[in-house]
Amino acid sequence: MRRDIADLFELDPRLTHLNHGAFGAVPRAVREAQDRARSAVERAPMRAFRDELPAALEAARAAAAAFVGVPADTAALVRNVSEGVAVVLSSLEVGPGDEVVVSSHGYPTAAYAVQSRGATATTATFGLGDDPHDVVDAVARAVTDRTRLVIIDHITSPTALVLPVAEVAAAVTPVPVLVDAAHVPGALPGLVVEALGVDFWVGNLHKWSYTPRSAAVLWVAPHHRDRVRPLVTSWSHGLPFPASFDLQGTVDHSAWLAVPDGLAAWHALGGWQQVERNAELLRRGAEHVRTALGTPSPRAGIPTAPCLEVVALPPGVAETPEGAASLWQRLYAAGFVVPPVSFAGRGLLRLAAAPYNDEDDYERLADGLPALLGAGSSAP
């Protein structure tokens, strides 16, 4: 790791951290800002909640909106993408008899949220080697007269693809589209949310934007704002979107209050120049791993995320969830924080690049992988 950058975080130096995209990493300075926000509440709870919190939350919300390039009155703070998905499903009153289209590359909890409401999650299937038009066609074919919503990932979690969300939205009109943008804020340059033609867009801030966990931003198109309400009804009841999301009972708001500090850390670490540096590092690192495993480079098709990439594992490795879990345990025991993924009967290794990584991290992984895979050759 780049020791000078790693020291800004609290990461265990005994581990090689190559999975920043999963839960992010909070810089020490941001955690300290969150601690100060908590302490301010403890010193004078009544004043903090009644007098100071509303304006502070409005400022944090405005900072988050500006970071993803949307006006302050168009985006609410939520705790994570899962909450944002639940908010949209509830606000649209999705229920039994309804269908919601998800994709075979989508994060599973979106389908679970659909099913929890008694609706059917219909899967649009496309392959790792397909082209963007195959994604659009697959989603459009999955839409029926009972489809109430399409949920499509902007960057797919298991496969690190950047999906053509604008083209999907155009193809399925007038069906509303919710974009799961969990991996997007701070990681995908050139983003113009309002130009995508989608209805809802929700992205985590803790993954690539260095905020504390439990901070995400939910953007809603104008024609839906009157009907979108938080899952908890409390003191913000009756306020227009997005202020209606600010006060949902007595909860710990410190993650939201530290959002401006996390975004400041993103800029201080290099902003988009750092993302470009990480992307180039990841391409070289992934090639080191592919060379060590003797697996091919991916076919050019759907674009891949700047700071996430998957490497194909040899046949027979991590092809099932059980096999992937077994390999994960061996990797972690050897000091590597990198997730194997079982996807459509294939074993993949998802790599990430963050400011604290250097090329040595990937070279160490490449050197250690063959023996680790051999040690688990009899695993499921």
Question: Residues of each region from the PLM?
Answer:
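PLP-dependent enzyme catalytic core of the Aspartate aminotransferase-like
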Residues: 5, 333-380
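A glycine-/small-polar-enriched, mobile loop at the entrance of the PLP active site in fold-type I
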Residues: 14-61, 68
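PLP-dependent aminotransferase-like
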Residues: 39, 47, 90-149
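Conserved beta-loop-alpha segment that forms the PLP phosphate-binding cup at the N-terminus of a helix
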Residues: 51-65, 69-97, 108-111
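Conserved PLP-dependent catalytic core of the aminotransferase class-I/II
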Residues: 59-63, 255, 260-298
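Active-site phosphate-binding strand-loop segment of PLP-dependent enzymes
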Residues: 130-186
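Active-site PLP attachment segment
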Residues: 195-236, 252
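Conserved PLP-binding catalytic core of the aspartate aminotransferase-like
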Residues: 279-283, 292-334
